[in-house]
A protein has these predicted regions:
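Conserved N-terminal segment of class I S-adenosyl-L-methionine
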Residues: 1-92, 98-102, 117, 222-225
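S-adenosyl-L-methionine-dependent methyltransferase catalytic module, highlighting the catalytic core
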Residues: 15, 110-119, 129-230
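A structural micro-motif
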Residues: 57, 79, 128, 175-176
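Short catalytic micro-motifs in class I SAM-dependent methyltransferases
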Residues: 103-107
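Helix-to-beta-strand junctions that scaffold the AdoMet/dcAdoMet cofactor pocket
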Residues: 108-109, 124-126
Length: 233
């Protein structure tokens, strides 16, 4: 992350939450692929790490910001939170089954993102999985809202991707089985993937819409997109 940007305590406190829908959907991926050892890169306040630790997994987190490390260390097991840059991960080769980076790569320069993917590939085990969420530069709402688009609202967002550009980048860094349409946890309240105009619709309809926005072709048109890839054997 660029050192000149203001990642202070207020920044991380404002974002001190866990989207349970993301956590449970990621848990489905972990269980279906029998993954045990997890690293959350850009872990922020550490809520996702804590979620997986409580679920019985060997979960770790890293962030390069002091305030994030202080917050994450308070709620997670001793020795599981590390101060580190995404572009220089201090872990052994082939040491993790899953690497997640939730709303992280938009904070990196293009060069840092390239280094992060190399580092992720290095420390993933054979057939290990990388899971990313980032703002979608191809979102219809970006074209409709212009400068008011949510991706622009955070000045620490410096690099943007579309599902296609990130797919190509992952492929260049030797990842395989790249997917942006994923199985989603169902029946978990969330407004995260829906336009504000439909936040008040009945919960059954909202659940169906959320599912479609992740597991159908609509996934590539959300404001933020999910993408998963695997280290080749």
């Amino acid at each position: 992350m660029a050192k000149t940007l203001n990642y202070n305590k207020a920044y991380f406190k404002k974002r001190d939450h866990l989207d349970l829908h993301i956590a449970q959907s990621l848990k489905l991926i972990v269980q279906e692929n029998n993954l045990k050892r997890i690293l959350d890169v850009g872990c922020g306040s550490g809520k996702l790490v804590r979620f997986f630790q409580k679920e019985g997994f060997n979960a770790y987190g890293c962030d390069n910001q002091k305030e994030a490390i202080l917050l994450a260390s308070k709620i997670n097991k001793k020795g599981t939170i590390t101060k580190a840059s995404a572009a220089n991960l201090p872990y052994k080769n082939n040491s993790f089954d899953l690497i997640s980076a939730i709303s992280t790569i938009e904070h990196l320069t293009q060069k840092e993102t390239e280094k992060f993917l190399d580092e992720a590939y290095r420390i993933l085990k054979i057939k290990g999985i990388i899971f990313l969420i980032t703002p979608n530069f191809n979102s219809p709402l970006r074209y409709l809202t212009g400068s008011r688009w949510f991706g622009y609202s955070d000045p620490t967002h410096i690099t943007f991707f579309t599902p296609r550009t990130l797919f190509d980048l992952l492929k260049r860094h030797k990842f395989i089985n790249i997917k942006s349409r994923l199985k989603s946890a169902y029946n978990i309240p969330t407004n995260l993937h829906l336009p504000k105009q439909v936040h008040s619709v009945p919960m059954p309809l909202k659940n169906m819409l959320n599912y479609l926005m992740i597991s159908s072709p609509l996934a590539n048109y959300r404001d933020s997109f999910w993408i998963l890839a695997q280290k080749k054997s």
